[in-house]
Amino acid sequence: MQLLLSSVCMALTSAVIGFAYYQKQQFYPAVVYITKSNASMGVIYIQFFVIVFMFGKLLSKIFLGTLRAAEFEHLLERFWYALTETCLAFTVFRDDFNPRFVALFTVLLFLKSFHWLAEERVDFMERSPVLGWLFHIRVGSLLTVLGILDYVLLIHAYNSTLVRGPTVQLVFGFEYAILLTVIASTAIKYVLHAAEMRTDTPWENKAVFLLYTELVIGLIKVVLYILFVVIMAKIYALPMFVFRPMFFTIRNFRKALNDVIMSRRAIRNMNTLYPDATPEELRQSDNICIICREDMVNHSKKLPCGHIFHTTCLRSWFQRQQTCPTCRLNILRTPTVNSTAMPRQGDEAVAAAAGNPIPAAAGVQPAGGVPPPAPTAVVDGNQARADVNVAGGQALPPNFADLFGDASGLPNGLPNLAGLQIPPPPVMPMISPFMIPPHFGYLTPLPPPPIPQDLTNFTDEELRAMEGLQRDHIVQRLKLLQNINLMLDSAGIMMSQYQSLSARLQLTAVTPATAVNGSADSSVYDMPSTSATAMAQLETHQVTPTAAASSASPTMPAEKVTIEDLGADADEDDIPSTATEAVSIPNSDADFEENSSELGELRKRRLKFLEERNKSAATNERTTAE
């Protein structure tokens, strides 16, 4: 594609030059003809850009070799922004717009492109494990050539401004000054990376030098941009084309300054606040530093989160980030919870030997059994932190055994909750009983600690000793409240299940009547009681023998169903008679829908009768037993 475009441009240029020479027959008149023709100048400009592009490809092959995909992508992104800024610069210097002006801006964009490629290649140098001598020759030669060109063009613009006054060379001088700072920063990075590659161990101070280099270069760029904007605003107009690069320069300088301040603070905290890792801690944890992937023998630091790293690796890491490399904990915050990387033997004994700051009163069990916060265990170098937010009422579910073991040390085994004002814990939403299995043995928690029978006999000192004022006591109260809430929720769910089960058993406790027409003794009570179809079958099959006999004859009208047919023989006075009420036995779904109200009333009366009979039978049994 590139070869085709180059061939087309070359053919058009040859045609334009040949046509001009054919018209004028002399060199000078032909040149004048081409310069006066806009179409001819357009073709010449295109050919000039093609030549510059091909020359750039040649220099890229010489100094850089094959470009990587990331380098080419970043080059295109920056080039389009630079081209837009160049078009804005044309509007400021529209009076000076001529072929020489276009050529100068083309050369500027050409040099900017190679500055960007050199910067990308030096950054890649830090990530590449093996670099040959050809790489160093290419990068060193490119940096040298670019530095010389920037300096020469800067001096030329400076001299031109002194001789001719403020012209367009002022803009080019400023641009080449910025490019000179860029090439200086790139050269310093290259020297630092090359020096580190010559050593077997990582260079500890390289990150510090890089950080301060970015800070100084950023400061110089900010000063240059501010001076250029002030000068251009006084002489020409406000230079809109430098606002975008000036904004990014100020932002990068601010970031570099913030990195310097934060890194110094982090390193100071590391040297003063964080203890050195002991050999025992190194043995109990994974003694491989995840930054350099080497074993940690000595000179290691333990962060507040419990992770251990080399001191030199942490110093280099803190130059860029002020967080733990493993868990991303912000190490600049003041540590509030003392954590350990792995639980050690003897911690429980030390915690049990800790005394209670509140003196025990006479006749009261000492409250020294209240343990301090247990050390947080971290598995595989990761910290499992459980922060109790008293203000928000949020806490992790506690262990019942640990809770009641801690509370046993207080008088009567229960801390007093009086005077503690905390928001209620979040209420667990009630779950439908049909969505939970019928077995709930695993939901039943341990019983709460025993409650003192009479609190009025306790003195003020005893009550204060029971209540407690330390963080441990508050945490235990919150845990106890959460356990109570869990037990209440479990009780509510169990009661819902019991109610639904008892209602179902009342429906299935009735013995089915004799089958109609000698049918098999299949029971309809095994079906769910909530099904409308099952209810219809239940009412159809629960008719008395009299009703069954009447239903056997299809030509006979519907018989009357009385309470005697349901089995009433002793308590007729308690049940209102239904001898005068005629109820049709449904033979289809339509008949059942028409007589649903009568069947429902009949069913209610029958259930009431069964309840009364069961009560009387139970009373007779108790009387007989007495």
Swiss-Prot record:
SMART domains, sorted: RING (SM00184)
E.C. number(s) listed in UniProt: 2.3.2.27
Membrane topology (UniProt): Multi-pass membrane protein
One GO CC term on file: endomembrane system
Subunit details: Homodimer. Interacts with p53. May interact with Septin2.
Family, similarity comment: Belongs to the HRD1 family.
Protein name as it appears in the record: E3 ubiquitin-protein ligase HRD1
Native source organism of the sequence: Drosophila melanogaster (Fruit fly)
